[in-house]
From Swiss-Prot:
The protein's name: Diphosphoinositol polyphosphate phosphohydrolase DDP1
Nudix box (motif): residue ranges: 65-86
Gene expressing this chain: DDP1
Binding-site residues, Mg(2+) 2: E80
Matching Gene3D superfamilies: Nucleoside Triphosphate Pyrophosphohydrolase (3.90.79.10)
GO CC annotations, alphabetized: cytoplasm; nucleus
Amino acid sequence: MGKTADNHGPVRSETAREGRENQVYSPVTGARLVAGCICLTPDKKQVLMITSSAHKKRWIVPKGGVEKDEPNYETTAQRETWEEAGCIGKIVANLGTVEDMRPPKDWNKDIKQFENSRKDSEVAKHPPRTEFHFYELEIENLLDKFPECHKRHRKLYSYTEAKQNLIDAKRPELLEALNRSAIIKDDK
């Protein structure tokens, strides 16, 4: 992924990358590697959220799978933010890694039987489903035409509203990333 003609940010494609055949997984845990952005307004009072492609009434943040040809997580985060939200901006902070510890969709539902069969009380119930690498991005521009503009809605929310959206969407790992950002916490 090169630079735009003005050398500012990644090249912005007109189509979104889809499918998981070129995505990267952790060699240690098998978790899918994902990168995304917490996109804040310059005054840090609002965060940009998008509707989930799987659950249209749930609001989340832009993120997606790391591809084999991407040199780093930051590149993936900016690409996904462009494709899913039409957001252009500057990365201002690395928010670190957050693991999605929700059980995989096909995980054994009878976890009690597994727990009872083990004497080790500290055993992990399952490995992380996803390993997220998040960045804080300062919004410079929101373009109307972007690869997923016909699939998703986007909206700016205050911290309190965004926090509730992520609780409603059952996405504690995304809330963790939001909490690590410099957004003004208006719920205090």
